[in-house]
Amino acid sequence: MPVGAPRHWRLRALVRNPLVLGGLVLVVLFCGVAALAGVLAPADPIAMNTAGVLEAPSPAAPFGTDRFGRDVLSRAMFGARSSLFVGIGSIAIAATFGSVVGLLSGYFGGRLDNALGRVMEVFLTFPSLILAIAISAALGLGIQNALLAIAVTYWPVFGRLVRGATMGERSKDYVQAARVVGASGARVMRHHLLPNVLSPIVVQVTVAISQAIIIESSLSYLGLGTQPPTPSWGTMINEGRTFLDTAPWISVFPGLAIMGAVLAFNFLGDGLRDVLDPRSGGMNG
């Protein structure tokens, strides 16, 4: 394995990077709210109150109430659970499966690489949102199927990324030395190649999570993801679309939550890219 930058140097660089710090603080904040929603939420997110329908934001209900009198702040907090669960969970699956496929394809090459490359190209031909909608519609309604649809949509992104990085590493001296001493292909990939292609994977994970949150919200908005009365940012925006003139807070606050979460993961990814891959010059979109 090649000798890279000392770990303490990278840690210092991460700590000093304002994008990493800012993004990490926001990510921890959103995840903390999602995890502690049951404690932090001021009201039951699905409890209806016919006496308090469409109330404007006030000290009693900081984000107002919806058409059923449900507290929008509480629903936004619990909605973070659904959106972040699908966003993080789907990308975790996609990154794991895609990395394995990319390592196999890039290391062995030949017919295996050609076959796997063709499969990835087919998936990558379609826009992510359109493909996720099609897969989710085929699988059926529900948060689990939405998670699976996004995972299937994004694994080729990681597969192509890791394949390219692996092909760039496999001819280097440390890989050849491992082969000479009799290391198996599995050992070379696990102990030598994977650690050296991990940086771009980590960066891509943070960026992909932000995109997955948008797709999950879109699926829920269309009725394919999280099902009512379980709150989700996408379903909340959909429920408030007919009240944009009279009660805009129903849609505005979950929309702001989506924007904040997406920016948080993008900031974190941009900062990680600056530190782990300075040659990239930051995010390019």
Per-segment meaning from a language model:
Residues 23-26, 120, 149, 156, ...:
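Residue-level signature of the transmembrane alpha-helical cores
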Residues 1-99, 103-104, 110-114, 129, ...:
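Gly/Trp-centered helix-boundary motif
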Residues 72-77, 84, 119, 126, ...:
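Short hydrophobic alpha-helical segments within the ABC transporter permease transmembrane module
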Residues 70, 132, 172, 177-178, ...:
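A short, glycine- and basic residue-enriched loop/turn
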Residues 62, 66, 96-168, 172, ...:
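Generic hydrophobic transmembrane alpha-helix motif, especially the helices
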Residues 124, 135-138, 150, 165-166, ...:
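Glycine-rich helix-loop "coupling/hinge" segments at transmembrane-helix boundaries
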Residues 30-34, 133-137, 150-156, 207, ...:
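Alpha-helical transmembrane segments of multi-pass membrane proteins
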Residues 13-14, 76-79, 83, 104, ...:
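Amphipathic alpha-helical segments that mediate coupling or scaffolding at interfaces
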